[in-house]
Amino acid sequence: TRCAYCSFVSQSVERTLGLVEPYLEVLHREITDAARMVQEAGLHIKSFYMGGGTPTTLSADQMDRLLTHLNRSFDLSGCAEYCIEAGRPDTIDREKLQVLLDHGVDRISVNPQSLEDHVLTAIGRRHTARDVEEAMALATGMGFPHVNMDLIAGLPEDTPEGFRRTLDKCLSYGADNITVHTLSLKKGSRILLENFTIPSAEAVGEMLDYANAALRQADFRPYYLYRQKYMSGSFENTGWCISGAEGLYNIYIMEELHSILSLGAGGSTKMVDPVHQRIERVFHTKYPTEYIQRSEKLEENLSAFRQFHENMRG
C-alpha cells in the first residue's frame, strides 16, 4: 500500500504478485553486472543501504536469495554499514529478521510515522501502534546493533499531545536513531489530492520543539538535517541518534562527497567528483514492468557510472 503522504514510486505486492520473481531475476542480473563494473573500476563500497518502498514485503526466502547473491557478488569487506529498511511493522517477522542478521545486516529501520491508531488509519497504514511495539521488541531482542524509527510531525488527525505520546513511546522502545520528519505536501500525494485536514504550522512547531527537548534529554543529538519542498511550516527533517550510532549512508548523502550507485526500479544514481565539485545523476525507469523490460537502460546507467569515474582518474 502507499501512505497518504507519499508520492514515491510504489507498487502493491498483493496486486502485482506475478511481477516479484521476474523483477528479482532482473535485479540479480543487475547486481552481477554492477559488481563486475565496481571491481573493474577499482571502486570500494563504504556503505550498503536497501530501501524502497518496503523491502521486507519480500518473503524470507526471496530476501535470503537476494542477499546471498548480493554478498557473493560484491566485495563488502570494507563496508562499514549494512542497512535495510524494514519499514512497516506489518511486514516484519522473526524469520525475516533472522535472514537479515544471518547476512550481516547491522542496521534496520522500523517506521511507524505515528503511534496514534486514528492517525495511522487516516494516512492509510494497515498496522496498529501495538504492531510497532511488537516489531521493536523483536528487533531489539534479536540483537540488531542499530535500529532507527521514523516519525512525521504534522500528519492528518495528529495533535501536539498525540505526537508527544508517540515520541515518548519510541524512546521507550530502545531505538538508537530517531528521524523526525516534517510533513511534506507532495504533489501526487493523497493528502493534497483529497484535501486532507492537517495540523497548523503552530501545532507542527510545538511538535518539533518537544522533539528537540525530549531527544536531547534522552542523550540524542542531531547529526543531519535537510529540507524538502512544500514542507509544513517551512520546517525541516532531522536525524537524531545517540553517540556512536550515526548512520553513515545518511551522512554520505548530505556531504555529497561520495558517489551512490543505485540498483532496482526507481533508483537514482549520483556520481560525485569532489575535487572538481561536479555531480551528475542518472535515473532508472520508475516502474517494475519497465525495469523488467528495458535492460538497455540498466546497461546505459552502469556505463555512465563507469565512464564518470574513469574520467575522474584522467
Report the location of each language-model feature.
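Local cysteine-cluster metal-coordination motifs and their immediate loop/turn environment
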Residues: 1-10
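Radical SAM enzyme core and accessory elements
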Residues: 3-4, 27, 243-314
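Flexible glycine/acidic-rich beta-alpha junction loops that bind and position SAM and/or redox cofactors
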Residues: 4, 118, 122-123, 153-160, ...
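Conserved non-cysteine loop/helix-boundary elements of the Radical SAM core domain that shape
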Residues: 10-211
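A broadly tuned preference for mixed-charge, low-complexity surface segments
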Residues: 45, 99-107, 139, 228-237, ...
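Conserved N-terminal phosphate-binding loop of PLP-dependent enzymes in the Aspartate aminotransferase
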Residues: 216
